């Protein structure tokens, strides 16, 4: 027999990553009752910490965090070099990249961004997955978002007026269900949502290794006869 939670939430979110947590905060600000179900029991993981957990934040993300007063709670970017910015100022300043192709400030037409508010924040920052999740989880809990860890969504059934979500032998009800559970999303697969896009051309792996004479490797992006490597920080290679 399945155990049923008698509460009916406005929204259930699958996944307590940065996207799920930020969405939960926004919904809570709109007075919605929110439940997050996260399959991992422990939010702390070596894969979320430096060096594996290093992440780049784009301009819209930085601005969203700034507007909610969360940007000042991030500390790691103050101690790491942003490899996607150069020392130049003004029109020649690098403000980002796309697959390694640099964006120079003087070549960016900001008038094309119809829905972007002008501001003084950086266009890119380096952060860490665990730091970002910690800041967002703290805010979500302050907004009375309920987070249950160690419960993965295993299925759901949609009705005219809501969704019944299954997690093992437990049932939860909500008016809406949102899948923020990654590339292998159970919500997407169960709901038969299309995952449009192109097939990958290569697979990347993360590993911690000892390299002889690491000082011989140049910083930044480097193209060689045998391929390309990126050294974003001393000892951080891709």
Where in the sequence are the language-model features?
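Beta1/beta-strand and adjacent pyrophosphate-binding region of the FAD-binding site
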Residues: 3-19, 35
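Core beta-strand elements of the Rossmann-like FAD/NAD(P) dinucleotide-binding domain
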Residues: 7-9, 167-176, 180
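Conserved structural-core and active-site-/substrate-pathway-adjacent residues in large, well-folded domains
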Residues: 13, 24, 65, 133-136, ...
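A short, Lys/Arg-enriched amphipathic alpha-helix followed by its capping loop at the start of a domain
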Residues: 23-32, 64, 143
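Glycine-rich FAD pyrophosphate-binding loop
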Residues: 28-53
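Active-site-adjacent segment of FAD-dependent monooxygenases/related oxidoreductases
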Residues: 46-139, 233
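A conserved short coil-to-beta-strand element within the FAD-binding core of flavoproteins
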Residues: 149-163
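Conserved FAD-binding catalytic core of PHBH/FMO-like flavoproteins
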Residues: 180-238
């Amino acid at each position: 027999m399945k155990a049923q939670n008698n509460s009916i939430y406005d929204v259930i979110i699958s996944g307590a990553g940065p996207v799920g947590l930020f969405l939960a905060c926004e919904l809570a600000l709109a007075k919605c009752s929110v439940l997050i179900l996260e399959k991992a029991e422990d939010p702390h993981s070596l894969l979320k910490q430096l060096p594996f957990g290093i992440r780049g934040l784009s301009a819209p993300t930085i601005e969203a965090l700034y507007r909610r007063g969360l940007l000042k709670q991030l500390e790691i970017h103050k101690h790491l070099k942003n490899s996607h910015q150069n020392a130049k100022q003004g029109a020649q300043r690098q403000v980002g990249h796309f697959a390694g192709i640099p964006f120079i400030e003087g070549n960016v037409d900001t008038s094309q961004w119809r829905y972007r508010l002008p501001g003084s924040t950086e266009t890119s920052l380096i952060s860490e997955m665990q730091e970002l999740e910690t800041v967002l989880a703290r805010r979500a809990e302050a907004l009375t978002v309920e987070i249950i860890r160690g419960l993965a969504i295993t299925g759901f059934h949609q009705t005219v007026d809501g969704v019944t979500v299954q997690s093992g032998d437990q049932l939860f009800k909500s008016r809406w269900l949102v899948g923020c559970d990654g590339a292998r999303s159970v919500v997407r697969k169960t709901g038969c949502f299309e995952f449009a896009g192109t097939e990958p051309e290569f697979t990347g792996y993360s590993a911690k290794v000892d390299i002889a004479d690491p000082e011989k490797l140049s910083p930044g992006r480097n193209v060689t006869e045998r391929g390309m490597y990126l050294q974003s920080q001393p000892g951080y290679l891709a």
